[in-house]
Amino acid sequence: MTQAERVQKNREAAGHVISMCFLVALNNRYGIGEERLGRVTDAANAELERFDLEKRAVGMEKAKKRLAGKLGELLPNGFLLPATKTPRREKDWAMLGEQREAAEIVVGCYALAAHKALSFGPDRVQGTVAETERVFREFGAWTEGGDYFGYALLARELERIFRTPITVDESDAREPIFGDTLD
């Protein structure tokens, strides 16, 4: 796998995990159920598509500034993904930077979605984001047993909320992203 492919996979994985953490956080903190979580997800996907179009039109930095402008008082301090483990090598620091940038964008889009789909104001959005960080830290602890283990426990949380089986696809997994392998 090339470095560019690794970076892209890393960003995608971070985005997927933080979006799942956001949904779990909405359920944990406010009891938001399956139907309304579906509305939030649909609204977030629309925001993410808009962000992607803006990124292509004006570049990443301007698109991020526009997203921050839309968020305004909903999320004035943005979102900084906590490190699940201390980076040691330059590659680890770069990976953390990519994860943080992806998570910042995804959380921003989900925050806008919660505002639009659930009429959440700044207090509720910020409460959800704080709970999202807590859920992500919990996920980070789970990945100490390996990425698959962390994903499986996060999937269990989503199964509890959606009352439907969720499987973790590891068929294309070549190297860990959030934790260590068991071998």
Regions found by a protein language model. Give the residues of each.
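A structural feature that tracks compact, well-ordered secondary-structure segments
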Residues: 27, 115-116, 125-131
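Long, low-complexity interaction regions most often at the N-terminus
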Residues: 15, 30, 36-40, 55
